[in-house]
Amino acid sequence: MRGCYTALITPMNRDGSLDFEGLHDLLEYQSENEVAGIVAMGTTGESPTLDWKEHMSVVSKTNIFCGADLHVIAGTGANNTKESEEGTREAIDLGVKTILLVDPYYNGPSSLEIRREYYEPLAREFPGANFIPYIIPGRTGTMLLPEDLALLSEHCPNIIGVKEATGDFSNMRAIRRLCRENFPILSGDDEKTLAMMADPTILASGTISVVANILPWTMREMVNAQLDNDPETAKQLAAGLMPLMGIVTVKTEEDTPRGRVMCKARNPLATKTLMNILGMPAGPCRQPLGKMTMGGMVKVIEAARQVYATRPDFFEPIEEFFDVDVGERLHDKTNWEGLCYDSY
């Protein structure tokens, strides 16, 4: 597991139905930009708000559209091992060979339980499939600890890596220290990817990226430069990308009739908002996700403008593939209509 994998959004029509034509276009765009692979139905793909039939239709079409060109990884994690088993079986039957399993959320199992009652049963039930645990305690409220990940990878050789999204570098270092030699660590946080790869006590081998939905070529080049021992190029690309990496989640303070509050627009809301502005297939998010505030959307636009002003070449693949003028779209307010709430 090396390189840049895109945590793909799920494009939707205005009525909230799945946009498979848009999905095909996005996958073709990713393929042309030579990413290492695609994660279908992760957090960015809005897996919590798609029913299993929709979930599997996205996995199926992604696998068909990608063919042999891209490594497809299907998210089938749940907080119910039986449900995850059924989803995993269906994904494997559709031809997917690699599965992303998020730690069980909400019901709060211990790390021991996560290992013994979730990851190990699933990995053993499907010995011909590869599994990647996805550790993101900010979403799940629990986490597989490095010690249990090390035991898991020893007991189950089809655990082929980890998506690490704790934001905790000491946790990442513990994974590297405890797990088998060359065990792949993939960044789950765009802002931290280069630091994770460059740190000799972590040595991440790539990323599962949100920003790659928009700028797959540049994210790929950054990751590959670091893998190819060209840290200066990697740093230059990361510096150019940083404003967009900073808007995967957008925080704003908002005035309400009852006082001032903090508003946090979480992934994929900001990413889909920007993709809509740029003229890429994205559409709305599924409820209970909704829209950004005006202040949040302005932050997104300003970040994109900043990147465009310093590195317009980053956006050339979008302009060529989707036949759009990025500079015009980032300054024409008609492209933003309806993408944010009118008031709090």
Outline where the language-model segments fall.
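Active-site beta->alpha loop and helix N-cap motifs at the rims of alpha/beta catalytic domains
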Residues: 1-143, 290, 314-344
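A general structural signal for well-ordered alpha-helical segments in protein cores
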Residues: 23, 59, 84, 119, ...
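Catalytic alpha/beta core domains of metabolic enzymes, predominantly
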Residues: 121-129, 136-253, 263
